[in-house]
Amino acid sequence: MKILVDENMPYARDLFSRLGEVTAVPGRPIPVAQLADADALMVRSVTKVNESLLAGKPIKFVGTATAGTDHVDEAWLKQAGIGFSAAPGCNAIAVVEYVFSSLLMLAERDGFSLHERTVGIVGVGNVGRRLQARLEALGITTLLCDPPRADRGDEGDFRSLNELAQHADILTFHTPLFKDGPYKTLHLADEKLIRSLKPGAILINACRGAVVDNTALLTCLNEGQKLSVVLDVWEGEPELNVELLKKVDIGTPHIAGYTLEGKARGTTQVFEAYSKFIGHEQHVALDTLLPAPEFGRITLHGPLDQPTLKRLVHLVYDVRRDDAPLRKVAGIPGEFDKLRKNYLERREWSSLYVICDDASAASLLCKLGFNAVHHPAR
C-alpha cells in the first residue's frame, strides 16, 4: 500500500508508515507522476484536489490535514467512490491565539484596553466559539454573526453582519469560503461593508483570503479610511497584493493555524480516519508526539492585567515575528510558500506552565488555555 503525504505534515511519515509505504511530496505543485501507483493521498490546503488531479488514478482515499475544505472537490470524490476526511477544528486554538497576539499588540501600540472594545465574530464554528469563550472569560463583549447557524436554530444571540459592522470595534472573520449559494461568503466584506465600519475599527481576516475583497479594502485604505487591518490570508495566494500589504498593520503568510499542536492534530485526525477506512483503526495520543516546549515553567506574581497577559501571550507567540519576514520578500515568486514551508516552530499557550500566587490569576489563565496552577506565596 503506497501513501503519499505532504512533506510539510509533521509526524506524517512516522504515523502513516504504520499502515504502508510512505512517500513525502511537495504540496504545490504536487508531482502528478507519483499518483500513478498510490492508494492514498494526504494533503494540506495548498493542494487542489479535483477530477483533473485524480481522474484515472488508483487513489482510494484523500485526507486533508486542515479544517477548511474549499481546496477539495468533495462532490467529485464522492461520485468517484473515493474516501475522504478532513480535520475539523485541528487548528482552531492556534487561530484564536493568533487573533489574541494581534489584538494585544495593537492595544499596546495604540493605548487602549480590550475591555473597552466590542468584538464582532463572523462565523461561530470551531474557531469562533473558542474565540468567544476566551474573550468573554476576560469580560470582553462579543457580538455573533452566523446566518447558517441562526437559520438552524442553534444556540446563540446571532446578529446581522450589518449590525456587527455598526456596533463592533473589532470585526474578525472565521468563515468557510462559499463562492455561491444562500450563505455565500465570497467578498462578504465588500466595499460597502468596509466603508460602514466604525472609525478606528480593527478588521481581521484569518479564514480565507477571498472572504474580504482585497481590492475594495485597498481602495478604502488608500482613501484614508481610519481602519486597522490584520490579514493572514490573501486573495490569489500564493500571490498577494503587495500594495495592500504595505497598508495593513499586520500581514502574515497564511500561518494563523500553524502551531505545532495544530499541525499535529491535523495529521493525527486524518491518520485515524484512514486507519479506520482500511479496517486497521488506530488512535494516537497527541502528547506522545510533541516535544518539550522551549519554556518549561514560569512564575507569575499578583493578578492578571492586560499588560501581563500581553507579555505571557507574546512569550509564547508574538505575531510580529511573522509580519516582518513577509514584508521583506513580498512579491518575489515562491517566497510566500517558502515562508510557510520553513515555518519556525510555534507552540500553543497550553505548552506554558504558569505558577501563580494569585488564585484568580490561575483560574483565569486556565480558562484562557494556559497550563496554570495556584501556589500561594509563603
Curated annotation (Swiss-Prot):
Keyword hit for Plastid: no
Keyword terms of this UniProt record: Cytoplasm, NAD, Oxidoreductase, Pyridoxine biosynthesis
GO molecular function, one term: protein dimerization activity
Transmembrane segments: none
Active-site residues (renumbered): R208, E237, H254 (proton donor)
Class of this enzyme: oxidoreductase
GO aspect biological process, one term: 'de novo' pyridoxal 5'-phosphate biosynthetic process
Alphabetical list of Pfam families matching this protein: 2-Hacid_dh (PF00389), 2-Hacid_dh_C (PF02826), DUF3410 (PF11890)
UniProt KW NAD keyword: yes
EC number: 1.1.1.290
Catalytic activity: 4-phospho-D-erythronate + NAD(+) = (R)-3-hydroxy-2-oxo-4-phosphooxybutanoate + NADH + H(+)
Record localization: Cytoplasm
PANTHER family, A to Z: FORMATE DEHYDROGENASE 1 (PTHR42938:SF9)
Subunit comment: Homodimer.
Name of the molecule in the record: Erythronate-4-phosphate dehydrogenase
Organism: Escherichia coli O81 (strain ED1a)
Gene that produces this protein: pdxB
